[in-house]
Amino acid sequence: MDGMVLLIRKLMGMGAGLINAPGGRVDPGETPEQGAIREAQEELRVTPVGVREASVLAFQFVDGYSLRCHVYTATSYEGVPTETIEAIPLWIDEREMPYGQMWADDRLWYPLVLQGRKFSGRFLFDEGIMLGCELDVEPAAEKAKS
């Protein structure tokens, strides 16, 4: 659906209650891309198609917990988005992203993903409060002149 993004309302685990993209831990023996596809299958009962990596984000929490997040996009999917015990599927108009119901960092980098920009980011959190961030955004590609 053009201009629409398939996200989830997370029902359990870290970030429960928030709107986010499907995702989770990479299992032993998986690549991050394989893990992203498996998580979409588990959380939404869909298989992403045309998957590409958009970014790698690093999160540090003041309690010492840290994680590395590989962000992927897909051009399509197979299956029907279905509610599971982990997530409720939500179609969101990309011009009306519900940032107030998402992690605080999302408003900084989701627009870059939607624009197809390449970037990396580092974020510092104290529980759900973002204390700091650093984004490195690659320059936009020049359009060829004819």
Show where each model-derived region lies.
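A short, polar/proline- and glycine-enriched secondary-structure boundary/capping micro-motif
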Residues: 16-20, 94-95, 132-133, 143-145
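Short loop segments at secondary-structure junctions
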Residues: 2-4, 11, 75-80, 94-96, ...
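The catalytic Nudix box helix
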Residues: 21-54, 72
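Active-site-adjacent beta-strand/loop module that shapes the phosphate/pyrophosphate-binding cleft
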Residues: 59-85, 90, 106-118
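Charged phosphate-binding loop/patch that engages nucleotide di/tri-phosphates or the phosphate backbone
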Residues: 115-146
